[in-house]
Amino acid sequence: MPTPHQLLERFAGIKLAVLGDVICDRFIYGDVQRISPEAPVPVMRAQQEELKAGGAANVAHNALTLGASVHLFGIVGEDSWGESLRKLLAGLGLHTEGVLPVAQRRTTLKTRLMAGSQHLLRVDEGVTESISAEMENALLASLRAAVPSCDALVLSDYDKGVLTPRLAVQATKLFRDAEKPVICDPKPANIPRFV
């Protein structure tokens, strides 16, 4: 049986396609020194803000950190969060040509308020409705072009509407027809679309 180190060595150099729900994780760090007089809630003084890759983008970043070359495919809105996230992802070294900006959709944003090590609150923004057939087709065209240069596909489902049943089936077919493995990480309620 290979050791963990041997497994990591095998992972280095793999070329992955990651398709799924691209999320912008926003962290606001601060400190709490009092309770609000308006309601029994803490008042946090914001001191620092940080954006991180979330959802499928986090999966892609983790694979990149382990030594893989990663092509990310997903949807962001044509908004400031989408633009900031695409810049962040490109700066990390991910191939982001497959992260498509779409005017009809807001970027999925999860804002976490952190006081020290205490997670005070999370605010989620964005839509969870399934993407349109037009968006599915655009992602499939982008993914199809990447199949020859990728060794495997990871489907990363966070139930934000990108991995529709049709897109999951068609993306899987592209890689299976090329005799390349497909790895699925679905939300439990969505498992039937990946079987």
Residues covered by each model-derived region:
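Flexible glycine/proline-rich, aromatic-decorated loop/lid segments
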Residues: R34-E38
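Ribokinase/PfkB-type carbohydrate-kinase core domain
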Residues: M1-Q33, Q48-A56, A60-V195
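Divalent-cation-assisted or electrostatically stabilized phosphate/pyrophosphate-binding catalytic cores
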Residues: P40-Q47
